[in-house]
Amino acid sequence: GGDYWLKVRAESGGETVVDSVFVHVLGEQVLAPVPEGLVDGINYIDETTVQLVLYAPMKENVFVIGDFNNWVPYTDYRMAKDGDRWWFTLTDLVPGKEYGFQYQVDSDVIIADPYTEKTLDPKDRGIPEATYPNLKPYPEGLTSGITAVLQTGQENYDWVNASFDAPPQEELVIYELLVRDFIAAHDYKTLTDTLNYF
């Protein structure tokens, strides 16, 4: 197996056209059990390592693509298979740095991790800095669709209300609200100022 770039250059009448295509020749699929204790999604192992697990039944190949490999499905990023689950270990990550990534499934389907806590969308460029400061830019021209984001070395959230006591789950009333569609400012600060029970 291996990774290859096929490059073509054509010249005619003083004009030159160049094109290329990425091809990988696959070796044997690595079959290995998902390491003990891992759950589907992003598993943070330490400051520089994550293990990714994806449930994808009846698939033949799954690759991890992202900022760490310039969004190219190199054979070194082919996930190991364990029945209907696929897994991969990413190492040498920079603590605290956000990495966008996706799964390339059977060469023609590209998806974000379904369990990710943060995504990037091509439409994100319309989000004002005041609404989301320092939003990681979408990888324009490198991929398409929604991407997942992982980040090792995240700081734990400091809870400011130490006296909060959550009610029993059976007494909760939960509803979903898409802030983007609910208020023009698209931010949580305006939402909490608008709804008087926060």
Predicted feature locations:
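Coil residues (strongly favoring Ser/Thr
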Residues: D19-S20, E47, E155, T194
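Exposed beta-strand face motif in extracellular beta-rich ectodomains
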Residues: G2-L6, K97-Y99
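Core domains of carbohydrate- and sulfate-ester-processing enzymes
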Residues: V109-N161
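Aromatic- and glycine-enriched glycan-recognition loops and surfaces
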Residues: D82-G96, R180-F198
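Extracellular ectodomain segments of secreted/surface proteins
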Residues: L26-V53
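C-terminal edge beta-strand
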Residues: V17-E28
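Aromatic-rich carbohydrate-binding modules that target alpha-glucans
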Residues: D46, V53-E98, D106-Y132
